[in-house]
Amino acid sequence: MAASTVWTILKGAGLDPAPRRSGPTWGQFLSAQADAILAVDFAHVDTVLLRRLYVLVVVEHGRRRVHLAGITAHPTGAWVTQQARNLLMELGDRADRFRFLIRDRDSMFAPPFDAVFAGADIRVIQTPGRAPRANAVAERFIGALRRECLDHLLIIGPRHLAAVLREYVRHYNGHRPHRSLDQRPPASGTPARSGAVVRPLRRDRLGGLIHEYVQVA
């Protein structure tokens, strides 16, 4: 990403670039602040009845934990703002650890949406136009969701989509390994002790579309 793009993003968020014009790159900023960053984005899903549904997802940069914020056929600024309130309620005391929220320039992210996060001392950073890589963590999740799940299923309607996404997000957070987390899932607990006698157990999800493997004594 060009230095001028990084400068625009940081300046728009009220973060003054270093006077010597050699401050951190966008990637360095994301790495340094990962545990304090949320990213939000929309995915769309077309049903077998040719109806388009919109999915609002939020990703915690540090742990790669995903939150399914909401599903609707008619996204509006008011709806998106309510999902922001719901997310902060879901996070509870954990919301205090976040300082930044990255979003694109979608018109659904209206000033009231930003105000919800501002009220929680979370600064909204708006990415430049036509720069999807600026919100790469959220984009990567949406890409994985399509490749691993949605591209293989025919979605009937909102209730069906909600059930599918809930199961996939449970798998993603609880079992899917991530390279940035040393091949552990976002919600991983304490790893098994070295030398313990264990055997793998396979669990099928989404009708066998996805396989999970757990260790049992």
What residue ranges belong to the model's regions?
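Charged DNA-binding/catalytic regions of mobile-element recombinases
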Residues: 1-217
